[in-house]
Each structure stands twice: as structure tokens, then as C-alpha cells.
């Protein structure tokens, strides 16, 4: 029976490149001259920490990072950006988490979405991915289109397609 997996993965190498590009832009920006501003990637925690002297500059750093990520093929929705900034002394900071894998709650939403569409496929939640199995390729392709058009707050990739 044909099957495929729905996953949500970010290549950390591309994230590292995006952070380096954002840092390069940061050094050339006139409004950040003489300002303590840092964009750093923590690969162990899968997070990006932004630090600067004011909240406005922090928002500018976020825009630079998002722009660099989009240029590297990383979708904006794969970044979990907190709404409020932490304030330590004269510095403001935000820690942006990278969304890796599909959480159980979102996997259940995907399963419910597919069942509500009445496509003749079966879904299985397997850790941080969802396996979809069906009798025909057309049903699987209809499922892929359904997931691509759904707004679930996270980008998805489809891999391990078997016939």
C-alpha cells in the first residue's frame, strides 16, 4: 500500500547560515553602529537568542533574522517568536525557539483534518511525524494538497513516499 510521512524539520545548517547572514547585515547597518547587538544560535537548545539595547532595535533584529531565514528557505512559521522581551540591566533579549517535529496536539489536528475530509486513507502518529497510508496514490496526493492548504501554524514536509 502506498504511504508517506508528514514531518516538520529545519536544517540547522541553513539556520546557522541565516544567523551568519543576519550578523553580517547587522555589522553594516547604520542604525546599529556603536550599539551592543547580538544574534547567536544555540544548536543544542535549537534556539536563537537576540540581544540589544532597546525594544525597537530588538524588533529590527527580528525582522533582519526573518529576512535572512526566508532567503535561506526557512519559513517564518517555523520560528516560535515570543511576544514579550526579557529585560536584564540595559539589555533586552528574546529567545526564539525553532519548531522541530510535529507536536502531539498538531498531529491530532492533522489526523482530524484528514478524517473530516473523508479521504480514504489511514493516519498513524509516530512520535514527531504522521504516517499516511492509502490504497491509491490519488488519495495520498489529495491528502498532501489538503495539508499544504491547511493553516496549522507550522511548515510541513512530505517524505518517505512509498508505492
From Swiss-Prot:
InterPro entries tied to this protein: DUF520 (IPR007551), UPF0234-like_C (IPR035571), UPF0234_N (IPR035570), YajQ-like_sf (IPR036183)
Transport is among the record's keywords: no
UniProt GO MF annotations: nucleotide binding
Keywords: Nucleotide-binding
Cross-referenced Gene3D superfamilies: 3.30.70.860, YajQ-like, domain 2 (3.30.70.990)
GO cellular component: cytosol
HAMAP family tied to this protein: YajQ
UniProt family annotation: Belongs to the YajQ family.
Role description: Nucleotide-binding protein.
PANTHER family for this protein: UPF0234 PROTEIN YAJQ
Protein name per UniProt: Nucleotide-binding protein HD_0358
Organism field: Haemophilus ducreyi (strain 35000HP / ATCC 700724)
Origin organism lineage: Bacteria, Pseudomonadati, Pseudomonadota, Gammaproteobacteria, Pasteurellales
Amino acid at each position: 500500500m502506498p504511504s508517506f510521512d508528514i514531518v516538520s524539520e529545519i536544517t540547522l545548517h541553513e539556520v546557522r547560515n541565516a544567523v551568519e547572514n543576519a550578523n553580517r547585515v547587522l555589522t553594516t547597518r547604520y542604525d546599529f553602529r556603536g550599539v551592543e547587538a547580538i544574534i547567536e544560535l544555540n544548536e543544542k537548545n535549537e534556539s536563537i537568542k537576540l540581544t540589544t539595547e532597546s525594544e525597537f532595535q530588538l524588533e529590527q533584529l527580528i525582522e533582519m533574522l526573518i529576512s535572512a531565514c526566508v532567503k535561506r528557505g526557512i519559513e517564518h512559521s517555523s520560528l516560535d517568536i515570543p511576544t514579550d522581551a526579557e529585560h536584564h540591566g540595559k539589555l533586552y533579549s528574546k529567545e526564539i525557539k525553532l519548531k522541530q517535529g510535529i507536536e502531539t496536539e498538531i498531529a491530532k489536528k492533522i489526523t482530524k483534518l484528514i478524517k473530516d475530509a473523508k479521504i480514504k486513507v489511514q493516519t498513524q502518529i509516530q512520535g514527531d511525524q504522521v504516517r499516511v497510508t492509502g490504497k491509491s496514490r490519488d488519495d495520498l496526493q489529495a491528502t498532501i494538497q489538503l495539508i499544504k492548504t491547511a493553516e496549522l501554524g507550522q511548515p510541513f514536509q512530505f517524505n518517505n513516499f512509498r508505492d
